[in-house]
A protein has these predicted regions:
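Active-site HxH/HxHxD metal-binding segment of metal-dependent hydrolases
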Residues: 87-170, 189
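Zn-dependent metallo-beta-lactamase
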Residues: 22-68
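Bacterial N-terminal signal peptides
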Residues: 13-24
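Metallo-beta-lactamase
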Residues: 69-71, 75-79, 170, 177-219
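Acidic/histidine-rich helix-loop elements
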Residues: 44-59, 133-135, 142, 212-219
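Pre-active-site segment of Zn-dependent metallo-hydrolases
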Residues: 49-59, 65-99
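Bacterial N-terminal signal peptides that target proteins for export
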Residues: 2-15
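Short, solvent-exposed loop/turn elements at domain surfaces
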Residues: 43-44, 49-54, 71-73, 81-82, ...
């Protein structure tokens, strides 16, 4: 069996080959999905910290296109960032975004939920992260506003509309299977792997880090 493709922290240079780092950081973020498998795409975020230029989108965002609609893996850090993600998805597919899967409790995984829920999109996460999201959502927003300023305007911490409770769950949309695997949390309590068996592809969220180290912050 071939090894699965891992999507978490692919190099930012994949989106900005040939640009000097200081130049790319000075420009506003452009959300653009690149194909990684048949019907599967990813926006590869910067591996550095949140900045006003990257609008807090220093994470990878997945897009899975099915015959019954599209699925986003994570919703971005802000309302405005979520709108950019949606616009980028429309350049890939005319399919409506049916689901947003929040892989964890970091701001850039779920604070864009409000935008998508206003469009009628269902947001899905593991119930192990519910308390963490409730307790830290406003703190995340305060931190984002300090960095992003007006780019955080319109953002309201909006909890997922559907909670998964078992360690292993399987959902299907348009004949495409999504297997959710919660193994006790990682960076946050709700961190969940999303396995696409038909694609042999794994979205790892904040469970696996590549090309960077976890932040070590005194508390």
């Amino acid at each position: 069996m071939p090894m699965p493709t891992h999507l978490h922290a692919m190099p930012a240079r994949a989106l900005a080959m040939g640009l000097a780092l200081f130049c790319s950081l000075a420009q506003a973020v452009t959300v653009e999905f690149q194909r990684v498998a048949d019907g599967v795409y990813a926006f590869v975020g910067e591996t550095g910290a949140r900045t006003a230029e990257n609008e807090g989108l220093n994470a990878n965002i997945g897009l899975v296109v099915t015959p019954a609609g599209a699925v986003l893996i994570d919703s971005g850090a802000t309302f405005q960032g979520a709108r950019q993600i949606a616009e980028a998805a429309r350049k890939v597919t005319p399919q409506p975004i049916r689901w947003v899967i929040n892989t964890g409790g970091q701001d850039h995984r779920w604070l864009g939920n409000g935008y998508f829920q206003a469009q009628g999109t269902e947001s899905i996460a593991h119930a192990a992260g519910e308390a963490d999201m409730k307790n830290r959502g406003n703190d995340h927003l305060v931190g984002l506003k300090a960095v992003l300023g007006a780019k955080a305007d319109g953002t309201v911490p909006t909890l997922p509309s559907r909670w998964l409770k078992s360690p292993d769950e399987r959902l299907e949309l348009g004949g495409v299977a999504f297997e959710f695997k919660h193994r006790g949390g990682a960076h946050t309590p709700g961190d969940t792997l999303v396995w696409l068996p038909q694609k042999n592809l794994l979205f790892t969220g904040d469970v696996v880090y590549v090309d960077r180290m976890l932040g070590v912050i005194p508390v």
